[in-house]
């Protein structure tokens, strides 16, 4: 992709902003950076990328597109909605609008293994990357997992494997993005404050497969209706995985063994008790990782080694410590009800559950119904506190308390807990009402738990 002397408008700096602008500068582009945050708020970011080749428009969107001159390309941060008036104005002018993932794809080489879904993306991405690395393949693990794709795009070669976690926000702005292997883990309502309807959300997720052909692979969850049904319309070769059923072909569990069945041969990979990551949802993640790595030539033996050694990832059912017989579990990545239901199912009862945060427009009824026989006390805080509290009472779960914030929740939970209990942070909500991201929320929880031991 030729960027030299091209005029590129970057809208929204966010996490991807610094590496994105650096790459554009390196490629010789003329850059305009537009962000709704002020120069004061972005001082550190601006210091990191400098002023050479860059014009900044901060604290507002330009009132008239014409004031920017002749634009060749617009690159959006994933957090910028496509339906705001300024973006609509750009669209009306016929200027190409892409996201960081699309730009990185155009600048990269190598086989792309792309993973999306409502839940399990980060764990599956990390696990898949570890299996490839353990099998001796030069592997980049990028995307929504923490390292922007654009940061590594120019380093990649034809022989590399690029494992990328992609969100629905990122998939809204792809055009040519073309994974060799694309995986849809599952789909349940999420981000409806952005996508408005489940149909729009589904459509964004399925963009993952839109440029695939018969030479590519779509890895699909047979147990998830959306993922399974998607297979009927996709051009790629379909590989299904299932935790609940034995398949004629695909990856599944048979007699407690993760099993690969091809047309020619069956491979018994590993006993599920040898996998360290907890929960039935993580078994599904392991099945998906098995399928993706096997497709690209990793042996059953190397897959087993990777599954056996993988410890899990931070903020996802992460064991923090045990104090006076009470286990503290950090599942800050539980940013929607489905993820938190899976955490409740995986954690050891009795559970004192800490939940709440920014509202994504979801319903908490199924979340509360999952408490039965598992949750002994619910502590809620944040923007969704009233909603969760009222939903709990409406569904006859009476042992619920509203608290000011996470710190008060941890202190109250310690006072309630008895030896043998689990204190589980699994908020079922986004973190943005109180924290910049779920990682910051999880780190704060771990710091609060550490302070309990010191006290």
Curated annotation (Swiss-Prot):
- List the record's Gene Ontology CC terms alphabetically: cytoplasm
Q: Which keywords appear in this protein's UniProt record, sorted alphabetically?
A: ATP-binding, Cell cycle, Cell division, Cell shape, Cell wall biogenesis/degradation, Cytoplasm, Ligase, Nucleotide-binding, Peptidoglycan synthesis
- Top-level EC class as recorded in UniProt: ligase
Which pathway does it serve?
Answer: Cell wall biogenesis; peptidoglycan biosynthesis
Which Gene3D superfamilies does this one have?
Mur ligase, C-terminal domain, Mur-like, catalytic domain, NAD(P)-binding Rossmann-like Domain
What coarse category fits the chief subcellular location reported for this protein? cytoplasm
Keyword Zinc-finger carried by entry: no
Catalysed reaction equations from the record: UDP-N-acetyl-alpha-D-muramoyl-L-alanine + D-glutamate + ATP = UDP-N-acetyl-alpha-D-muramoyl-L-alanyl-D-glutamate + ADP + phosphate + H(+)
**Annotated ATP binding sites:** 117-123
Gene Ontology annotations of biological process type:
cell division; cell wall organization; peptidoglycan biosynthetic process; regulation of cell shape
Gene Ontology MF terms: ATP binding; UDP-N-acetylmuramoylalanine-D-glutamate ligase activity
Q: Which cysteines are joined by disulfide bonds?
A: none
The protein's Enzyme Commission number: 6.3.2.9
Cellular localization per UniProt: Cytoplasm
**Which Pfam families does this UniProt record tie to the protein?**
Mur_ligase_C, Mur_ligase_M, MurD-like_N
Q: Which NCBIfam families match?
A: murD (TIGR01087)
Could you say which protein family the record assigns here? Belongs to the MurCDEF family.
**Protein's job:** Cell wall formation. Catalyzes the addition of glutamate to the nucleotide precursor UDP-N-acetylmuramoyl-L-alanine (UMA).
Q: What is this protein called?
A: UDP-N-acetylmuramoylalanine--D-glutamate ligase
Q: Which organism is it from?
A: Alkaliphilus metalliredigens (strain QYMF)
Q: Which gene encodes it?
A: murD
